[in-house]
């Protein structure tokens, strides 16, 4: 496992994938697509409106977490099955991947069969007092927008 400082976040692709520029040391850097290890988030590119809404919320949550970081870094594993680097994002000692799970924006995932229960994520968010997630999901299902 290697650890790199992240010089720049180029793009947050979705709730579990980011494009970053990592600092290799000696004035060298490299752009990498990192698949967040150990988690899976709802898809933001799907025809299922409920999953899409929750996927976009996961992406927004990750965006806000990363923006609030003081010193973002990644601990990498091997490359994943689609050629992306697998990694754990950290801000100090805080493991952002696991925070996504405990706050209800991702499921734990070990690379096997995906157990996707949108209800389970919704229950975690509701227990933490995040009622906005349910409202946007309802709005997506009824094709209305909230103000």
Located regions from the model:
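Small beta-barrel nucleic-acid-binding modules, primarily SNase/OB-fold domains
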Residues: 1-147
